[in-house]
Curated annotation (Swiss-Prot):
Belongs to the RRT14 family. Involved in ribosome biogenesis, probably through modulation of rDNA transcription. GO terms for cellular component: nucleolus. Residues 1-31, 39-62, 115-128 have a biased composition (Basic and acidic residues). It holds the Pfam family RRT14. Residues 1-74, 100-155 are annotated as: Disordered. Keywords: Nucleus, Transcription, Transcription regulation. InterPro entries: Rrt14. This is Regulator of rDNA transcription 14.
């Protein structure tokens, strides 16, 4: 009798857990569908704004982000030679379209990079050959260090 009650209780709990999982799965799918519909509506509005030339800075940023994500996803695909040629043509077409829009930012970034390359790094300015950060001599033989000590004593 006790075993039968235990089996019923176990079955009841398993059924309850199964129903909970189904409910969670349905809620997750509904959220995904709502999110996807929202994204599609947002993209449609952005496309209309882009066609009319009324994109805000936030919308441009969002479109650039989506473009970068799509490009990253496309790079992960394994392509045949024909597909690679088509992808290269598409890539050049996309770059031609978006290249002129973000030219000022690219020029500014390149100018900053050239300045950084021209300036020496701060950590290299403070380094001395043959010394560790604790100023202990490294890579010098005992003879060299004793010769220096003798010449210092003679002066």
């Amino acid at each position: 009798m006790k075993q039968r009650v235990a089996v019923r209780e176990r079955d009841r709990l398993q059924e309850k857990e199964r129903l909970r999982r189904q409910r969670q799965r349905a809620e997750r799918e509904a959220r995904q569908q709502a999110s996807q519909a929202e994204q599609e509506a947002k993209l449609a509005a952005l496309e209309r704004h882009q066609e009319t030339g009324r994109l805000t800075k936030e919308e441009k940023r969002y479109l650039n982000k989506r473009t970068r994500q799509g490009a990253a996803r496309a790079r992960t695909w394994d392509l045949d030679e024909d597909e690679a040629d088509e992808a290269a043509a598409l890539q050049s077409q996309i770059l031609d379209r978006i290249g002129s829009a973000s030219g000022a930012g690219r020029v500014r970034k390149q100018r900053r990079a050239r300045i950084r390359e021209a300036l020496p790094k701060a950590s290299e300015d403070r380094r001395y050959a043959g010394l560790t950060p604790g100023l202990a001599p490294v890579g010098m033989s005992d003879e060299e260090s004793s010769d220096e000590e003798l010449s210092d004593e003679e002066d």
